[in-house]
UniProtKB/Swiss-Prot annotation:
The lineage of its organism: Bacteria, Pseudomonadati, Thermodesulfobacteriota, Desulfovibrionia, Desulfovibrionales. This is Small ribosomal subunit protein uS4. Gene3D superfamilies: Ribosomal Protein S4 Delta 41, Chain A, domain 1 (1.10.1050.10), RNA-binding S4 domain (3.10.290.10). Keywords: Ribonucleoprotein, Ribosomal protein, RNA-binding, rRNA-binding. Residues 98-161 form the S4 RNA-binding domain. It holds the Pfam family Ribosomal_S4. CDD domains: S4 (cd00165). Part of the 30S ribosomal subunit. Contacts protein S5. The interaction surface between S4 and S5 is involved in control of translational fidelity. SMART domains: Ribosomal_S4, S4. One of the primary rRNA binding proteins, it binds directly to 16S rRNA where it nucleates assembly of the body of the 30S subunit. Belongs to the universal ribosomal protein uS4 family. The keyword Protein transport does not apply. One of its GO terms (cellular component) is small ribosomal subunit. It comes from the Bacteria. It comes from Nitratidesulfovibrio vulgaris (strain ATCC 29579 / DSM 644 / CCUG 34227 / NCIMB 8303 / VKM B-1760 / Hildenborough).
Length: 208
């Protein structure tokens, strides 16, 4: 399966914002973006004239990297969002948020989306009582994600209650750290996504 090989901190510096790809490390003084908040490379500090297209492209790349999705799959999400009823940009973000790996990250069962993706691929979680290993699976209202008893001693999962208390949980999800369970209460709305994203730029880019 194709994946990013570029350093995670380099991706944040290239996009000019924290993408929280390294989980808790991003909140410490070890964060490379805090120490060097400019693009990587010899000319990273140089000021460049940025075109409208470049701004749109950077916004798309930022969101794509944040969710850890390659271009072909991201474009497929956009196509699906564009064909659905409602606002295309909001539809796109809802589809991204409803990915199983993202939901597990939001519930506090992983420190980053990448870690959540790895845990899903190893079959650590069950969805409605059935073992799943597909990170891109779309959750629905009423779905229950749970960690089986035998997997609850995995360090990152054992810390779930602490992570949930520290990071909180979106209103559309219900996290039960004590029982290693999460429930999808509703579909994510635009206001549930606090990360600074200008989805209109992505729509403009793909509409050219």
């Amino acid at each position: 399966m194709a994946k990013y090989t570029d350093a995670k901190c380099r991706q944040c510096r290239r996009e000019g914002t924290k993408l929280f790809l390294k989980g808790d490390r991003c909140f410490t003084d070890k964060c490379a973006f805090d120490r060097r908040p400019y693009a990587p490379g010899q000319h990273g500090r140089a000021r460049k004239k940025v075109s409208d297209y470049a701004v749109q492209l950077r916004e798309k790349q930022k969101v794509r990297r944040m969710y850890g999705i390659l271009e072909q799959q991201f474009h497929a999400y956009f196509t699906k969002a564009d064909m659905a009823k409602g606002v295309t940009g909001a539809n796109l973000l809802s589809l991204l948020e409803r990915r199983l790996d993202n939901v597990i990250y939001r519930l506090g069962f992983a420190n980053s989306r990448n870690q959540a993706r790895q845990l899903v691929r190893h079959g650590i979680f069950t969805l409605n009582g059935r073992k799943v290993n597909i990170p891109s699976l779309q959750v629905r209202i009423g779905d229950t994600i749970e960690v089986p008893e035998k997997s609850r001693k995995i360090p990152v999962l054992a810390e779930a209650q602490e992570v949930i208390a520290r990071r909180g949980c979106p209103a559309w999800l219900e996290a039960d750290g004590a029982n290693f369970r999460g429930v999808v209460k509703a579909l994510p709305q635009r206001e549930d996504i606090q990360f600074p994203i200008n989805e209109h730029l992505i729509v403009e880019l793909y509409s050219k």
